[in-house]
A protein has these predicted regions:
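Asp-based, Mg2+/Mn2+-dependent phosphohydrolase catalytic module
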Residues: 1-5, 87-219
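N-terminal helical cap/lid subdomain that shapes the substrate entry/recognition surface
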Residues: 1-98, 107-111
Length: 219
């Protein structure tokens, strides 16, 4: 039985094209160049934050976020940055009686933006809210503690094997992989994916049918 579905944020619900484009602008480099280096860093298995260091050695992401905010150019996103399938899929799950959560590695500011979008979710939380960061077990323990069921009744949805699927699986949840965004396409053929993803999707529109099939009473 699937009682709860919890979504990652970046590249699962939110298209981060605009966000990373503004980072390229802030660094003063062409967006195409930034995207190419960003993808190469991910493909090499490095932390995505290392991409910034290629353009500005010693780059401190938290410090630069503060500088952007002080300059009136904070990281931001809105309704137009949501993937088109995000809101309908979440609403369909709630209509089915499934508890819907949103939990990702995001700042408190991003959490406020998410709550302001009035998403069809029962819970919205960020790593800043919990003081716990993926892929740490404490983050996924917080997910389990927030849901109205045990780990076996939760499906965690994300685009990354390392940050989303593997740690959620290790905590006893089921997992759904969404192939989109840089990580989604790069991780699609990763050798660890078959063992860490219970389902693979190309759109969140597939989720309600997945849940319905699992929850359908046996005849």
């Amino acid at each position: 039985m699937i009682n709860a579905v919890v979504f990652d944020v970046g590249e699962t619900l939110v298209d981060e094209t605009r966000e990373y484009g503004t980072w390229a602008d802030w660094l003063g480099v062409p967006r195409h160049t930034f995207s190419a280096v960003f993808g190469a860093v991910i493909a090499l298995g490095m932390d995505y934050r290392q991409a910034f260091g290629y353009f500005r050695p010693g780059f401190d992401l938290e410090a630069e976020r503060a500088r952007r905010a002080d300059a009136g150019q904070p990281e931001t996103f809105g309704e137009g940055d949501l993937y088109r399938d995000a809101r309908p899929a979440m609403a369909a799950l709630r209509d089915m009686g499934v508890w819907v959560g949103v939990a990702g590695n995001q700042t408190s500011r991003a959490g406020g933006i998410l709550r302001g979008l009035d998403l069809p979710a029962d819970m919205i939380a960020t790593s800043d809210d919990w003081g716990a960061v993926k892929p740490g077990a404490s983050f996924f323990r917080a997910v389990i503690d927030s849901a109205p069921c045990d780990a076996a009744g939760i499906v965690y949805v994300g685009d990354r094997v390392d940050n989303d699927l593997k740690p959620a699986k290790e905590m006893g949840m089921r997992t759904a992989f969404i192939r989109r965004g840089p990580w989604g396409y790069i991780w699609e053929n990763h050798p660890d994916l078959p063992a860490t993803a219970d389902w693979r999707m190309t759109t969140l529109a597939e989720l309600p049918d997945i849940v319905a099939k699992v929850n359908r009473p046996a005849r």
